[in-house]
């Protein structure tokens, strides 16, 4: 039986280098889906590229840890009005304002529809914040309300004891294509691991990009260029097919 592989490029809209890298990996490689950051400075540029390449499915990358929110979020922003990774400290302290988060989720969704002219194909999140135990029920309910698939990290489900209410998703998600020691064989090992688990639909996260001044300030910079080289390798797509996978998106879930 042919299996589904979703190669989803996160961070669409982060900057032009990221946007161009994702499009290149879609046109000339194995990226089959992407998710957009609606509070990022180059989101309109991403939407322009999306209009040029409408075959690329675009979902929403819900953001609570980067940039400025679209709504007032005094409980999660610093003195400069910026979001940050202190979200986990607030979560650990039990001080998350879920009403603020729900309003921001709705606003990012509405902006997606306005900017891209259509709803997202699915929802995931920056730094996987939607898998936090306090936030997951909120985002899962929102996805069900909008009839949208949702990225589900089964490791996080087990770790936090989350209850899955039959969400539309891939059977498995793997965040392992990330870091300093990436290669084509390491990408293919993720498929082999999924096979060992008997998985018929797999999502792999990636961040292919060309380096620009914005990415030079990121803690995850040059590996994005390595990802792009691997994902556009002429031997990768045939190797995926040889392992019984077809490339697709959350529209196939």
Swiss-Prot record:
It is found in: Cytoplasm. Keywords: Carbohydrate metabolism, Chitin degradation, Cytoplasm, Hydrolase, Magnesium, Metal-binding, Polysaccharide degradation. It comes from the Bacteria. One of its GO terms (biological process) is diacetylchitobiose catabolic process. Its cofactor is Mg(2+). InterPro entries: COD_ChbG_bac, Glyco_hydro/deAcase_b/a-brl, YdjC-like. One of its GO terms (cellular component) is cytoplasm. Pfam families: YdjC. Pathway: Glycan degradation; chitin degradation. It catalyses: N,N'-diacetylchitobiose + H2O = N-acetyl-beta-D-glucosaminyl-(1->4)-D-glucosamine + acetate; diacetylchitobiose-6'-phosphate + H2O = N'-monoacetylchitobiose-6'-phosphate + acetate. Mg(2+) binds at residues 61, 126. Its main location: cytoplasm. GO terms for molecular function: chitin disaccharide deacetylase activity; deacetylase activity; metal ion binding. Its EC number is 3.5.1.105. Homodimer. NCBIfam families: PRK02134.1. Belongs to the YdjC deacetylase family. ChbG subfamily. Involved in the degradation of chitin. ChbG is essential for growth on the acetylated chitooligosaccharides chitobiose and chitotriose but is dispensable for growth on cellobiose and chitosan dimer, the deacetylated form of chitobiose. Deacetylation of chitobiose-6-P and chitotriose-6-P is necessary for both the activation of the chb promoter by the regulatory protein ChbR and the hydrolysis of phosphorylated beta-glucosides by the phospho-beta-glucosidase ChbF. This is Chitooligosaccharide deacetylase. It comes from Yersinia pestis. The lineage of its organism: Bacteria, Pseudomonadati, Pseudomonadota, Gammaproteobacteria, Enterobacterales.
